[in-house]
């Protein structure tokens, strides 16, 4: 394509930037829809569908809940002394022992999950005057009746059940978790058959706390052939403290303690399969990459994960403002510089030059300005990820029915946090996009001004991103302009002379229009005079008669 106004004594140099036929729409602070040459998606909207077992240690609960594994349900014995980073509970988990309830189930589950271990230490509790190791047909261990392996069901010995008073000090330097329980018989007959007394009582104390439980005797819905229940309780004994257990019946005693650890282990409900792969971020839907700052896969996460937002898509501009190249314009197929449109097909840079001189036409990228823009944009995605990705986990929240108001408040807080992060993400991306577009526009303007300062009076700004150079400028001359070594003094005299000649020709060419208009006016006047004279002559000879009626 030819550039306008060229002959052997002049040249034309245009500056422009990269463009693509179909850009990407992004949002900025000042414009909801602006087209750029390239953009990166910031929201991860899909998972792998599987949970990766690396770098986190994943423990698959299979058909056991964490609490069943903690108590020692017979079908969960494989989990004894296990450790994990993330315990995965399955929807098909079930209990196969004596029916029980945990009044503070959510707290116990969360406490054990964060500890990341089921390491159990057996202690020598002395239970005098009672029968130990009680079992039930509802809790088969093999063909025989059994019970939870971490608990000791105490019943009467003969016809007596003495008052039990046992102490166990914590002489170690770590917290100890003791699990114990209270049996609620279904009938008074069952109560006396097991514990002699018509009503038992269990009190468990430390220096910091005390719990007293009185059994509730009564029939309940049948579960695995039992209408009685066991309530599970737990006590933490600090270093230097003492555990005191006092009971006259219905005690489900501890066999030892669980060693508590501090850490960032957690628990998650998921039916996604566990596979051999690597992923830092895990959701109930499966693992997701954490190479994006945001995700809308699931609010529940574990590991170094993107922030959860409501948006399905947020695009970060990683290219310049896109102005697709116009089709050939004008009689000679002229094209303009960056002020009118971008240039398609410039694959070796973002900014560049097009020229036409006596040696022909050419195009070259300006690598320095291109690299300056790329260097500033490349770090944007990493900076956004650093601002949002943190090593934390958002666990599931569970509340009992009596804690409904707390659950509502928790849900409100979580929803508010998500709303805030969604808004912050929108603003953050819009700000970064605005900065990117301003930055790339600035680099184009810098290159244009740099070229203008080099050419000075040797060229004229054509107003469309191009310069008309008023001296002969071969390819070596064009290259010197591009690389900044152009010396305008060398060409100044030639440029001034050519400028005056070209302007003079343009001035003389302008008089032709005036002459044409004057000639046309005189011709019209003479034609009117001749016509009028002919009419007057014809009237005098009588060839034309003119009647005027009033």
Curated annotation (Swiss-Prot):
- Gene transcribed to yield this protein: HA
What domain of life does the UniProt record list for this protein's source? Viruses
Q: Which residues lie on this side of the membrane: Extracellular?
A: 1-514
| Family the UniProt entry places it in | Belongs to the influenza viruses hemagglutinin family.
Instruction: Give the location in the cell.
Output: Virion membrane; Host apical cell membrane
- Provide the protein name: Hemagglutinin
PTM note says: Palmitoylated.
Q: Which Pfam families match?
A: Hemagglutinin (PF00509)
Q: Which UniProt keywords apply?
A: Clathrin- and caveolin-independent endocytosis of virus by host, Clathrin-mediated endocytosis of virus by host, Disulfide bond, Fusion of virus membrane with host endosomal membrane, Fusion of virus membrane with host membrane, Glycoprotein, Hemagglutinin, Host cell membrane, Host membrane, Host-virus interaction, Lipoprotein, Membrane, Palmitate, Transmembrane, Transmembrane helix, Viral attachment to host cell, Viral envelope protein, Viral penetration into host cytoplasm, Virion, Virus endocytosis by host, Virus entry into host cell
Per the record, lipidation of type S-palmitoyl cysteine is found at 539, 546, 549
User: What disulfide bonds does the UniProt entry report for this chain?
Assistant: 14-466, 52-277, 64-76, 97-139, 281-305, 473-477
Which chain positions carry the site (Cleavage)? Answer: 329-330
Upper classification of the source organism reads:
Viruses, Riboviria, Orthornavirae, Negarnaviricota, Polyploviricotina
Entry keyword annotation includes Transmembrane: yes
Q: List glycan-bearing residues.
A: 8, 22, 38, 165, 285, 483
Query: What is the topology of this protein in the membrane according to its UniProt annotation?
Result: Single-pass type I membrane protein
The record lists the organism as Influenza A virus (strain A/Swine/Hong Kong/126/1982 H3N2)
